[in-house]
């Protein structure tokens, strides 16, 4: 993994830092595993805006990812490491021994030609998926299930990982990417290794246009709005906006919004550090 800093031959390239894409082996996706995406522009079925600051961007096709890895005991070969425009991590194309092909989230260190196996009998090696009950303590893991059979929902972004800290009864203690320590059932599965493209955090857009290519629109500062649009809007001249607030009036900058009655609170051993 590496990044490239471009020469400042234009204003848009002066501060731009791009991904080197050293790990990418092909730019042609598997046609049987892609699907169309309709750009909603942040609007719902009624045409009303439900998400601000999104819309436009380059046309993309969705890559169908296997987050469950349920083909236990069937060996698979890594055919390629590919770029996915819909996520920050790279993806890997697997060809199973029975002829099926699937995409998975690629882990750091995954190579073309490598053999992968999922299931409780597989070895704890990079890219293999096992139940938490069969993973050695202290192992770096990613693509973790929160409920058995649900599919991976935790640690799927570029460079993220969690760590298996302990086992007690029917639960495993996991150090989450956020720093939170949480209990997860031992029957949930996880993949060995950290997620690929760990240098993604070093990428700098360099110009507003490239951010628009990604489908992100300009964000309006709350203090520049009218009072009808935001609690921090209005005032004579350039005002500070008063106490920082969110759009719906809740205090910003450190205010805890998590419900004290949330049923999953009992599974949190230690809150994340702020």
From Swiss-Prot:
GO terms for biological process: cytoplasmic translation. Keywords: Ribonucleoprotein, Ribosomal protein, RNA-binding, rRNA-binding. GO terms for cellular component: large ribosomal subunit. One of its GO terms (molecular function) is rRNA binding. Residues 214-274 are annotated as: Disordered. The keyword Ribosomal protein applies. Belongs to the universal ribosomal protein uL2 family. One of the primary rRNA binding proteins. Required for association of the 30S and 50S subunits to form the 70S ribosome, for tRNA binding and peptide bond formation. It has been suggested to have peptidyltransferase activity; this is somewhat controversial. Makes several contacts with the 16S rRNA in the 70S ribosome. Part of the 50S ribosomal subunit. Forms a bridge to the 30S subunit in the 70S ribosome. This is Large ribosomal subunit protein uL2. It comes from Flavobacterium johnsoniae (strain ATCC 17061 / DSM 2064 / JCM 8514 / BCRC 14874 / CCUG 350202 / NBRC 14942 / NCIMB 11054 / UW101) (Cytophaga johnsonae). The gene is rplB.
């Amino acid at each position: 993994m590496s990044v490239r800093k471009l020469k400042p031959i234009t204003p848009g390239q002066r501060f731009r830092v791009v991904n080197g894409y050293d790990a990418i082996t092909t730019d042609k996706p598997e046609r049987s595993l892609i699907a169309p995406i309709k750009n909603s522009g942040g609007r719902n079925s009624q045409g009303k805006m439900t998400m601000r600051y999104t819309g436009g961007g380059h046309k993309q096709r969705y890559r169908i990812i296997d987050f469950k890895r349920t083909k236990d005991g069937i060996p698979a070969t890594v055919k390629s490491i590919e770029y996915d425009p819909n996520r920050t991590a790279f993806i890997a194309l697997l060809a199973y021994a029975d002829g099926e092909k699937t995409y998975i989230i690629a882990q750091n260190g995954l190579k073309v030609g490598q053999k992968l196996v999922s299931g409780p009998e597989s070895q704890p090696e990079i890219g293999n998926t096992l139940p938490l009950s069969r993973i050695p303590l202290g192992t770096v893991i990613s693509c973790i299930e929160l409920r058995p059979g649900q599919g991976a929902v935790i640690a799927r972004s570029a460079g993220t990982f969690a760590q298996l800290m302990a086992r007690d009864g029917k639960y495993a203690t996991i150090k989450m990417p956020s720093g939170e320590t949480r209990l997860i059932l031992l029957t949930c599965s996880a993949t060995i290794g950290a997620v690929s493209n760990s240098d993604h955090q070093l990428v700098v857009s360099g110009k507003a246009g490239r951010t628009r290519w990604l489908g992100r629109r300009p964000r309006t500062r709350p203090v520049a709005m009218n009072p009808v649009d935001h609690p921090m809007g209005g005032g004579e001249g350039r005002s500070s906006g008063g106490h920082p607030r969110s759009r719906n009036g809740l205090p910003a900058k450190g205010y805890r919004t998590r419900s004290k009655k949330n049923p999953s609170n009992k599974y949190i051993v230690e809150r994340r550090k702020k």
